[in-house]
Amino acid sequence: MGKDEDEMRGEIEERLINEEYKIWKKNTPFLYDLVITHALEWPSLTVEWLPDREEPSGKDYSVQKMILGTHTSENEPNYLMLAQVQLPLEDAENDARHYDDDRSEFGGFGCANGKVQIIQQINHDGEVNRARYMPQNPFIIATKTVSAEVYVFDYSKHPSKPPLDGACNPDLRLRGHSTEGYGLSWSQFKQGHLLSGSDDSHICLWDINATPKNKALEAMQIFKVHEGVVEDVAWHLRHEYLFGSVGDDQYLHVWDLRTPSVTKPIQSVVAHQSEVNCLAFNPFNEWVVATGSTDKTVKLFDLRKISTALHTLDCHKEEVFQVGWNPKNETILASCCLGRRLMVWDLSRIDEEQTPEDAEDGPPELLFIHGGHTSKISDFSWNPCEDWVVASVAEDNILQIWQMAENIYHDEDDLPGDDAPKGP
């Protein structure tokens, strides 16, 4: 009987998800200025926009690139991938906003070819858990692998199509961990300084400018204080010696490289009631850090008074796996959870007055819910060149590139009687 009940439950859930998706699709023109949906051959666990942007002359779109990976079945090869994306110029977007029902796309703008194109595949041993580019030289990409090693690739030195022998040839192999993981962060201040957190409870720091032996580098420092998996690491964006780490032991630790101890962070707090999965330092405010947890909440901490959270965002119905600040707006934060939803928050609206009707949709700081995915979202990335454009990837192979409607985030619309929808 149990199996039948499970099957029925699964079928009901699938039907509900499909129903929700249909409603989302119908409402897309009211909620978005842009939606591009692209089915990848395999799911990607990682996505990150690259910082370059070109405007081909005489075209009504810009061309940008992003990093993706693969998570294939057992016998299929895995790749680190680069994709090229055509995004409408603002004028074109306003002239030709329409929804293409067949392709689940909104904001079409007359490109002859597909808007998303894989332009490079680099052989990779096992799935790409996470891939991030080095800020000082975006050709350099680090990847978290299914082994203990972290790989570094210079994609300008690799062919666009991978060698048929399937051999993975990273330009560097970084050693120091004993198991795989997800945490990965490049320093914006010190070129080549890379942090990594893994399931072995350790944090490794490498300087990729050091001299390798047989294309391999040992960690420059290994930090040990977490008891259990280190889920994420992040460099501070204003202070070059500071970085943060979070883990399954529920702790947020802040470290200072100027202190000699690799076992004593300068600040520590039990941040959540369950595993802490992610953290992000605010790019504008040097004191603010956000964390996300299996306890379904996102918390904000002030480094000057870290012992208690500044604020808790608790609308997610499932565990939170990723948080990320909008690179151009100090108060805008996004977070995604196991429950197929990506939420965008405007922290400047905390404690604003609400009508009881509005309160039913969520707290005032909940700006928008992206409901376009029908499977768990693995990663997302704010576009550094285009305001409010986000790329998100989910376990069902779907890559979505989207931009919420301008009237949702524009302050001039925050007038009495304004009830811009937040999304499904």
Curated annotation (Swiss-Prot):
Coiled-coil segments, which residues?
none
Q: Does the keyword Repeat apply?
A: yes
Q: Where in the cell is it found?
A: Nucleus
Q: Matching SMART domains, A to Z?
A: WD40
Q: Which UniProt keywords apply?
A: Chaperone, Chromatin regulator, DNA damage, DNA repair, DNA replication, Nucleus, Repeat, WD repeat
Q: Tell me which GO cellular component terms the UniProt record holds.
A: nucleus
The cross-references to InterPro entries, in alphabetical order and at most eight, read: G-protein_beta_WD-40_rep, Histone-bd_RBBP4-like_N, WD40/YVTN_repeat-like_dom_sf, WD40_repeat_CS, WD40_repeat_dom_sf, WD40_rpt, WD_repeat_RBAP46/RBAP48/MSI1
One Pfam family, short name = WD40
**What's this protein's name?**
Histone-binding protein MSI1
Q: Which gene encodes it?
A: MSI1
